[in-house]
């Protein structure tokens, strides 16, 4: 109450932000008359003037008003479109490391040109990021004339480009592309073997379209570059046959309840658990099939892999449904995006789940993948110096944007008042009653000529409605993962008089639904249309547009509430664009998954009290509130999952940053001779200390062991015992120096034989290849550690703390092994000439050619912390512009100085 009162008096934070930015809008508008008088050449010259002023010390804030005024004037001349004041506000929000919530149809694409131009002037690169290749290409080509008129270059970064084309795209002032491609390019750059192979410049400014989709919905999906691991397809097929014989039970066993089934399903957490009986039954079945030794346990250390396969098969059979979570096409299992309803060819679930689903469906089982490099979108995008985004629905996720990314959300007002009528939900007892009411509503709209967009949450639902509409003889279009080829065309015509369109979730997002149909597409369909033809198409469209408005505008019809309020708001937001008329209503039943899992008891109780009959619906604010509370619960749970994933990935990210920074330093260096000498001293000294402990008696020295180790690992054939017998003055320090001198002499002789330049190249190649191999093994070890870390909760230990501690130990091992392996290889390998270095490089390229990209879903199951009550707030990683100082604390969190920890490599 007090908060509302204060907001009334002082205005909300959003109002104050808009008021401050409004002052700059006044400045931009004041410049308009002067800029209209400039010739095209004078307007273009402004870009050079701005660049000169930036070089002379002015900031982007100093030139913002003038730059935005230039873009507005250029837009009028190139597109015959004048950005509204609210678009100027949106552009300023995007330039200030914030998220702009702009309603559908408010011109986000044109708004993005303002901050893109301003930041493009710097020459450091602007990345405009969209959700798919179609939108990236469309927006780049649409805006290219404007940017090129102002002297800025435009690049497009989509899948399938070669290295040269990618380099060109990234070297442009403004680069349009998809989140996947930018992320994959970052990982590929950090697997490169020479500076020339890298395509990205330092990450400067990212402007993300549909920011909620990329930073929220995709945040649980790490980008993974992987290579094929060992073939275990036969094992998946065998274990798949065991699962149908297992019996489900309603809930988990507890002290008060012991069921009779073999497994229980937790629908809220999307988990499945074997009961004790189920475990015994599976063990007996495995013994019968000869896959488990008599008397052995599924949970013994030697059978962890078998347990992994059983769990994957169980999840595939119980939690993943065909035509909802995936489709089978051409003997291949293709994931369906739960947020958009689109298929995602090339993406695979991780941890054997995809293979288990393939076995379940009788499709070809593909090999498991081994991770070579990975990063979450959260940690990729937080590396940008400036980050901003825009969407039609961000306010419900404002806390997460601020908490994870440090981005404030600003709701930008609409250019015209919004007049869409959002009607209360109608709740029915059963699904058939709900669908009967939906068909009746559609028939009513058809009679009025009002276009209808029906939003469904799954392919299965859209196909059910498809058949019901066919039975009712209602003409309609279907847009789901199976019919996505004509997506833009279907969505663009969804506003035609009397049109009925069924779409899964937010399919077609990014394409406006124009009332009366899209006249632009009609013009584009003609070859070389004349001015008369264009005028006639526009005139005909105006008549249709007015007819649709008179019929009530676009009617949005939701067949089920989504887990997230934001997705529901996105569906509603398709209607009422630019002040048009429109309406929306959701139809629900007690059999819907959200209602069944989260809101059933309370709402069912209300319905029973009201004594509802078949076909009757309930429409009450209490019901809407209960549904909204259910959605809040799901949103909170999903946020915790994303936050937890980030907390784990932050540990890996600290290590990733150290390894990638070291790797880039090695690659950019002319010579790493000093690094090799430092490592050689560390390694040899460490080995000497093992066999000749510091400050120990000579009787405790293991000289034969030291001679053997130096000979076997480093090719140093030394007679240390003879040295000691002949020289009484030798002690541990002088002995260490003599051994180091011997290694240096051996290495010097090798250098004289092959030449310094060849050896320097070989050193770099060995260092990079060894680091890459060990990093790959380290990632696999980290994956295994994370999958089992939740079990530490049963031992009353904090799983996250244990994960941090053990991953740090693994990283220390990686560094030690790297140093030993590099010195061992350099000591023993005989380099004859440049051809040996070239051959090594060619072998590396052949291996790289075998690598395939896989974009995989993270397994949330491995992140559930058993026994942990509280979830720590993740630390926001701020991108540092400066290099880490040698005496600064190491970023890995060990508490040691950088030079004594991960800085040892440099």
From Swiss-Prot:
The keyword Transport is assigned to this record: yes
UniProt-annotated binding residues for Zn(2+): 890, 892, 901-902
Record EC number: 7.4.2.8
Segments for region (Disordered): 879-906
Subcellular location(s) per record: Cell inner membrane; Cytoplasm
InterPro entries with a match to the protein in the record: Helicase_ATP-bd (IPR014001), Helicase_C-like (IPR001650), P-loop_NTPase (IPR027417), SEC_C_motif (IPR004027), SecA (IPR000185), SecA_CS (IPR020937), SecA_DEAD (IPR011115), SecA_motor_DEAD (IPR014018)
Gene3D superfamilies attached to this UniProt entry: Helical scaffold and wing domains of SecA, P-loop containing nucleotide triphosphate hydrolases, SecA, preprotein cross-linking domain
Major place of residence: membrane
Record has Cytoplasm as a keyword: yes
Keywords: ATP-binding, Cell inner membrane, Cell membrane, Cytoplasm, Membrane, Metal-binding, Nucleotide-binding, Protein transport, Translocase, Translocation, Transport, Zinc
Cofactors that this protein relies on: Zn(2+)
A Pfam family assignment: SEC-C
GO biological process: intracellular protein transmembrane transport; protein import; protein targeting; protein transport by the Sec complex
MF (Gene Ontology): ATP binding; metal ion binding; protein-exporting ATPase activity
Gene Ontology cellular component annotations, sorted alphabetically: cell envelope Sec protein transport complex; cytosol; plasma membrane
Main enzyme class: translocase
Membrane topology: Peripheral membrane protein
List of residues binding ATP: 87, 105-109, 512
Reactions performed catalytically: ATP + H2O + cellular proteinSide 1 = ADP + phosphate + cellular proteinSide 2
Cofactor note: May bind 1 zinc ion per subunit.
Functional summary from the UniProt entry: Part of the Sec protein translocase complex. Interacts with the SecYEG preprotein conducting channel. Has a central role in coupling the hydrolysis of ATP to the transfer of proteins into and across the cell membrane, serving both as a receptor for the preprotein-SecB complex and as an ATP-driven molecular motor driving the stepwise translocation of polypeptide chains across the membrane.
Subunit-level organization: Monomer and homodimer. Part of the essential Sec protein translocation apparatus which comprises SecA, SecYEG and auxiliary proteins SecDF-YajC and YidC.
Family: Belongs to the SecA family.
Annotated HAMAP family: SecA
Protein name: Protein translocase subunit SecA
Source organism of this protein record: Shewanella frigidimarina (strain NCIMB 400)
């Amino acid at each position: 109450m007090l908060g509302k009162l204060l907001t009334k008096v002082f205005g909300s934070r959003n109002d104050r932000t808009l008021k401050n930015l409004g002052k700059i809008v006044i400045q931009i508008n004041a410049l308009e008359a002067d800029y209209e008088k400039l010739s095209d050449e004078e307007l273009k010259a402004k870009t050079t003037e701005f660049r000169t002023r930036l070089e002379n010390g002015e900031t982007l804030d100093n030139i913002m008003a003038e730059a935005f005024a230039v873009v507005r004037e250029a837009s009028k001349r190139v597109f015959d479109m004048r950005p509204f004041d609210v678009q100027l506000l949106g552009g300023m929000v995007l330039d200030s490391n914030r998220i702009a919530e702009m309603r559908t149809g408010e011109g986000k694409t044109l708004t993005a040109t303002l901050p893109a131009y301003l930041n493009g002037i710097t020459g450091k690169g602007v990345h405009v990021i969209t959700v798919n290749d179609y939108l990236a290409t469309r927006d780049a080509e649409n805006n290219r004339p404007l940017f090129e008129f102002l002297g800025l270059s435009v690049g497009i970064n989509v899948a399938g480009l070669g290295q040269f084309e990618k380099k060109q795209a990234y070297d442009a002032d403004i680069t349009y592309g998809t989140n996947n491609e930018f992320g994959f390019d970052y990982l590929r750059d950090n697997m490169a073997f020479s500076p020339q192979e890298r395509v990205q410049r330092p990450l400067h400014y990212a402007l993300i379209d549909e920011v909620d989709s990329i930073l929220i919905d995709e945040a649980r999906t790490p980008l993974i570059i992987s290579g094929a691991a060992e073939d275990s397809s036969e094992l998946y097929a065998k274990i798949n046959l065991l699962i149908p014989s297992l019996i489900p039970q309603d809930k988990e066993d507890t002290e008060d309840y012991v069921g009779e089934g073999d497994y229980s399903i937790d629908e809220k957490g999307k988990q499945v658990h074997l009961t004790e009986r189920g475990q015994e039954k599976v063990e007996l079945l495995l013994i019968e099939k000869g896959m488990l030794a008599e008397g052995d346990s599924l949970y013994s250390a030697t059978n962890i892999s078998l347990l992994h396969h059983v769990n994957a098969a169980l999840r595939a059979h119980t939690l993943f449904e065909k035509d909802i979570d995936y489709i089978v096409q051409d003997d291949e299992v293709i994931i369906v995006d739960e947020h958009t309803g689109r298929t995602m060819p090339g993406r695979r679930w991780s941890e054997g789940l995809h293979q288990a689903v393939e076995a379940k469906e009788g499709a070809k089982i593909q090999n498991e993948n081994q991770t070579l490099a990975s990063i979450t979108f959260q940690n990729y995008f937080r590396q940008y110096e400036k980050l901003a985004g825009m969407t039609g629905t961000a306010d419900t996720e404002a806390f997460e944007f601020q908490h994870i990314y440090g981005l404030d959300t600003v709701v930008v007002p609409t250019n015209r008042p919004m007049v869409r009528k959002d009607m209360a939900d109608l709740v029915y007892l059963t699904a058939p009653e709900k669908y009967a009411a939906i068909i009746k509503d559609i028939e009513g709209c058809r009679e009025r000529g009002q276009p209808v967009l029906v939003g469904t949450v799954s392919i299965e639902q859209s196909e059910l409605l498809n058949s019901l509409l066919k039975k009712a003889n209602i003409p309609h279009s279907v847009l789901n993962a199976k019919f996505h080829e004509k997506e833009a065309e279907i969505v663009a015509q969804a506003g035609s008089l009397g049109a009925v369109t069924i779409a899964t979730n937010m399919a077609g997002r990014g394409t406006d639904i124009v009332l009366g149909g899209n006249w632009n597409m009609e013009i584009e369909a003609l070859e070389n249309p004349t001015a008369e033809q264009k005028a006639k198409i526009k005139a005909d469209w105006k008549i249709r547009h007015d007819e649709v408005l008179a019929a009530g505008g676009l009617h949005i019809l939701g067949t089920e509430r989504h887990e997230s309020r934001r997705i529901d708001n996105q569906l509603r937001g398709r209607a009422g664009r630019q002040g048009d008329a429109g309406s929306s209503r959701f139809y629900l039943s007690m059999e819907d998954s959200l209602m069944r899992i989260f809101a059933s008891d309370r709402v069912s109780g209300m319905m029973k009290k009201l004594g509802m009959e078949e076909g009757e619906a309930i429409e009450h604010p209490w019901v809407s509130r209960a549904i909204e509370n259910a959605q809040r619960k799901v949103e909170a749970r999903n946020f915790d999952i994303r936050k937890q994933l980030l907390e784990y990935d932050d540990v890996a990210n600290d290590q990733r940053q150290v390894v990638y920074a070291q790797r880039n330093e090695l690659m950019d260096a002319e010579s790493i001779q000093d690094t090799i000498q430092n490592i050689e001293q560390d390694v040899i000294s460490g080995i000497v200390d093992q066999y000749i402990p510091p400050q120990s008696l000579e009787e405790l020295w293991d000289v034969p062991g030291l001679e053997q180790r130096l000979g076997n690992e480093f090719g140093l054939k030394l007679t240390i015992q003879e040295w000691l017998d002949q020289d009484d003055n030798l002690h541990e320090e002088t002995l260490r120096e003599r051994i180091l001198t011997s290694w240096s002499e051996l290495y010097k002789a090798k250098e004289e034989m092959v030449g310094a330049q060849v050896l320097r190249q070989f050193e770099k190649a060995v260092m990079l290849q060894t680091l890459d191999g060990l990093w790959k093994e380290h990632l696999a070890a980290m994956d295994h550690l994370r999958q089992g870390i939740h079990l530490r909760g049963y031992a009353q230990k904090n799983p996250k703390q244990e994960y941090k501690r053990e991953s740090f130990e693994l990283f220390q091992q990686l560094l030690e092994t790297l140093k030993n392996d590099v010195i061992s290889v350099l000591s023993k390998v005989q380099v004859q000439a440049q051809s040996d270095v070239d051959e090594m490089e060619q072998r590396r390229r052949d291996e790289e050619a075998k690598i395939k990209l896989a974009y995989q879903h993270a397994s949330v199951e491995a992140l559930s912390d058993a026994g942990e009550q509280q979830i720590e707030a993740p630390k926001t990683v701020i991108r540092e512009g400066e290099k880490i100082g040698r005496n600064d604390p190491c970023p890995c969190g060990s508490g040691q100085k950088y030079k004594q920890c991960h800085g040892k490599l440099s």
